[in-house]
Amino acid sequence: MSSPNTETLTQMIEEISQKLNMLNVGVIKAEDFSDEKIEDLTYLHRMVMKKESFSPSEMQAIAQELASLRK
């Protein structure tokens, strides 16, 4: 059974991916992130969800930030 943090991570990652229209959503999985990074991911999630649209450079920066938060 998954922990509440894993479920929260999964939901946030899915929402970020949908908002950014990321094509390779399957590459980013909740299992790739430690529970210790949930605060950082929450901050990123809030930032992404507040914006209506993103420039290509912003999308790249967000993808890089997601990559840096992985285990």
From Swiss-Prot:
The keyword Phosphoprotein applies. It holds the Pfam family DUF1128. The modification Phosphoserine is found at residue 57. The keyword Ribosomal protein does not apply. Keywords: Phosphoprotein. It comes from the Bacteria. Belongs to the UPF0435 family. This is UPF0435 protein YfkK.
